[in-house]
Amino acid sequence: MKQGIHPEMKLITVKCACGAEHTMYSTVDNFRLDVCSECHPFYRGELGSQILDTEGRVQKFKNKYKDFLEN
């Protein structure tokens, strides 16, 4: 590995919009998140097996391939 060409990695605190703070190594000085594992519904168990389909794509797929899926 060549010396002196790689950016310096430093330990930073990443702040989420929910107020949670996480530490990680990065080449940037500060980093902000919109969603993290503390506030995302999937990691909190609120999403479960729900499928969020606001445009009917899942139902359209099921209707299109219903004969194939039944066999």
Swiss-Prot record:
The UniProt GO MF terms for this protein read: metal ion binding; rRNA binding; structural constituent of ribosome
Biological process annotations from GO: translation
- Cell inner membrane keyword on record: no
- Which is one Gene Ontology cellular component term of this protein? ribonucleoprotein complex
Q: Does the keyword Methyltransferase apply?
A: no
In this chain, Zn(2+) is annotated as bound at: 16, 18, 36, 39
Question: Which controlled-vocabulary keywords does the entry list?
Answer: Metal-binding, Ribonucleoprotein, Ribosomal protein, RNA-binding, rRNA-binding, Zinc
Q: Which PANTHER family match?
A: 50S RIBOSOMAL PROTEIN L31, CHLOROPLASTIC (PTHR33280), LARGE RIBOSOMAL SUBUNIT PROTEIN BL31C (PTHR33280:SF1)
What's the protein here called? Large ribosomal subunit protein bL31
Q: What's the encoding gene here? A: rpmE
